């Protein structure tokens, strides 16, 4: 059985491409099984919330971190869950 890990993803994205483009850096913490799934989660989040195209997102660093060092409450709560009943 695979274990879900916490990843810190740092990168930059081009916000507001059509009107006044601004490149902004970001740091997101996500829960995923591996680095590829962590990248996909960031693509989905930034694309759905900010309408950013995948080609406008660049990743600078993706690394696994200890869940206790993360400051986001949502990620801390998700890391405490040990099983899900469907």
Swiss-Prot record:
It comes from the Archaea. Gene3D superfamilies: 3.10.20.10. One of its GO terms (molecular function) is large ribosomal subunit rRNA binding. GO terms for cellular component: ribonucleoprotein complex; ribosome. InterPro entries: Ribosomal_eL20, Ribosomal_eL20_dom. GO terms for biological process: translation. Keywords: Ribonucleoprotein, Ribosomal protein, RNA-binding, rRNA-binding. It holds the Pfam family Ribosomal_L18A. Part of the 50S ribosomal subunit. Binds 23S rRNA. Belongs to the eukaryotic ribosomal protein eL20 family. HAMAP family: Ribosomal_eL20. This is Large ribosomal subunit protein eL20. It comes from Metallosphaera sedula (strain ATCC 51363 / DSM 5348 / JCM 9185 / NBRC 15509 / TH2).
């Amino acid at each position: 059985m695979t274990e879900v890990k916490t990843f810190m993803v740092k990168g930059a994205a081009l916000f507001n491409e059509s009107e006044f483009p601004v490149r902004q850096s970001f740091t997101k913490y996500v829960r995923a099984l591996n680095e590829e799934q962590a990248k996909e989660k960031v693509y989905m989040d930034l694309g759905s919330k900010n309408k950013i195209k995948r080609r406008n997102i660049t990743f600078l660093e993706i690394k696994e971190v200890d869940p206790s060092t993360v400051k986001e409450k949502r990620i801390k709560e998700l890391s405490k869950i040990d099983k899900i009943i469907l």
